[in-house]
Amino acid sequence: MPRKFDVLEHELVPKHVLLSKEEANRLLKAMGLKKSELPWIYSTDPVARALKAKPGDVIMIIRQSPTAGESVAFRLVMRG
């Protein structure tokens, strides 16, 4: 039986975290943003599918960099 590929475990895919509604609301309030002002990620994106993200959810992306250290970004899940 073939092994299933887990996109979240690939070395080139940064850590993605699906935020709860409460976490997303706290984040948006702290940053003074509306959900509509966040960059998008489509619900059909392989990582969004692996996280079972639904349109309207917010995903936190944590990237490691040898020069910048750690970079955190947020994406709004859109139907797509």
From Swiss-Prot:
Native source organism of the sequence: Thermofilum pendens (strain DSM 2475 / Hrk 5)
Quaternary data: Part of the RNA polymerase complex.
One GO MF term: DNA binding
Subcellular location: Cytoplasm
GO cellular component: cytoplasm; DNA-directed RNA polymerase complex
Name of the protein in its database record: DNA-directed RNA polymerase subunit Rpo5
Its biological purpose: DNA-dependent RNA polymerase (RNAP) catalyzes the transcription of DNA into RNA using the four ribonucleoside triphosphates as substrates.
Keyword annotations from UniProtKB, A to Z: Cytoplasm, DNA-directed RNA polymerase, Nucleotidyltransferase, Transcription, Transferase
Cross-referenced InterPro entries: Arch_Rpo5/euc_Rpb5, RNA_pol_subH/Rpb5_C, RNA_pol_subH/Rpb5_CS, RPB5-like_sf
Pfam families: RNA_pol_Rpb5_C (PF01191)
Catalyzed reactions per annotation: RNA(n) + a ribonucleoside 5'-triphosphate = RNA(n+1) + diphosphate
HAMAP family the record matches: RNApol_Rpo5_RPB5
